[in-house]
Amino acid sequence: MSQRSSELFERAQQLIPGGVNSPVRACLGVDSEPLFIARAAGSRLHTVDGETFIDFVESWGPMLLGHTHPEVTAAVHAAVDRGTSYGAPCEDEVVLAAKVVDALPGVDMVRMVNSGTEATMSALRLARGYTGRTKLVKFVGCYHGHADPFLASAGSGVATLSIPGTPGVPESTVRDTLLAPYNDLAAVKDLFALHGKDIAAIIVEAVAGNMGLVPPKAGFLEGLRELCDQHGALLIFDEVITGFRVSFGGAQQRFGITPDLTTLGKIIGGGLPVGAYGGKREIMQRIAPCGEVYQAGTLSGNPLAMAAGIATLDVLSRSDYAGLEARVSAFVKELEAILKGKGVPVRINTLASMFTVFFTNDPVTDFASAKTADGALYTSFYKQMRAQGIYLAPSPFEAAMVSFAHTDDDLAAMLDAARKVTF
């Protein structure tokens, strides 16, 4: 019984809208209350009630090394002693920028910001400023943060709470957002046939992670690249989730597709608030102060986040991505077999160190098919796994994450818990 968590949640609801600072954390999508965390280490979360959970959420993606990795925490401790914010450039900004540029094929220059939302909204402004066009192609169910242009048919918490858009976003703002189903290249071609001369950019999660995990079909990303080249539009890869996760060089390295602009977040801050956007030099040089497209931030390039990011990328650069992916692949096959043995419809999508359990018999290739999965079955699964110390995303529209800190025993514990689930 999570008594202290319940007490804190009740108090939080009097002070914070919904009791949380990001909607999906409220656990409304799984008919539960949130757990309040006291500390975390490795693959474990420890609650204010003294409970311990094996964490398959990883703070929604940043903790690929696990919680409180010693090299990352040492770097942050050292940075704190040097000052928490300067409002001026520091050496670590240059060091982290160089690491990002070296790792990602599509990034010649990079600008640090404070969140993935800042990164995507800044990249869109830059794309519009560079091309002189206004329209944006995005995909139904993909989530690119909570900036106004991206909230049309978005995924993540918007999907979890069944919000079709959001009040407060003028129709005039989303009028320039053109929608297509994810993985549907023909639909994108139709949009370009109608609006090609006005489209500034396509923004896409190269691997969708906010409608649950949905990998791109063969030829989909290549087709987007070709359409942008044909029509003079920019291709923006939202790699806030996939950057440094699906390979050290992100989805663009894994799939061999070079975008014009890339947005980053999560992993590059090692768990501290951070975001970034980068791309081709000729495009990035249009950003102020060397260009006319304005973007700024008081805490951008924060020394604590830069130190954490440097340490995180240093460790990841020598980590065994292939080994982790092989372990996750074998684990997912066994998990799927266990759940199918219980007589429920189930498909598990997986790529690299991510997976999503969809309770459906049909392939999940876009948001429409993701929504056909049985939400009640997911809620039951979530509750029973949580009761056994397994912490999964409190939403059927989020990806589960495995970190380098997860041991074979951790994965075995999840499988054992799944065997005890009843439907």
UniProtKB/Swiss-Prot annotation:
TM segment ranges: none
Quaternary structure (record): Homodimer.
Signal peptide: none
Protein known as: Glutamate-1-semialdehyde 2,1-aminomutase
EC id: 5.4.3.8
Domain of life per record: Bacteria
UniProt keyword annotation of Isomerase present: yes
GO BP annotation list: protoporphyrinogen IX biosynthetic process
Family: Belongs to the class-III pyridoxal-phosphate-dependent aminotransferase family. HemL subfamily.
Top EC class, one word: isomerase
NCBIfam families cross-referenced by the UniProt entry: hemL, PRK00062.1
Gene3D superfamilies: Aspartate Aminotransferase, domain 1, Type I PLP-dependent aspartate aminotransferase-like (Major domain)
Cofactor names: pyridoxal 5'-phosphate
Subcellular localization(s) per the UniProt record: Cytoplasm
Disulfide bond residue pairs: none
Keywords, comma-separated and alphabetical: Cytoplasm, Isomerase, Porphyrin biosynthesis, Pyridoxal phosphate
Single GO MF annotation: pyridoxal phosphate binding
Catalytically driven reaction(s): (S)-4-amino-5-oxopentanoate = 5-aminolevulinate
HAMAP family: HemL_aminotrans_3 (MF_00375)
Pathway in which this enzyme or protein is active: Porphyrin-containing compound metabolism; protoporphyrin-IX biosynthesis; 5-aminolevulinate from L-glutamyl-tRNA(Glu): step 2/2
Cross-referenced Pfam families: Aminotran_3
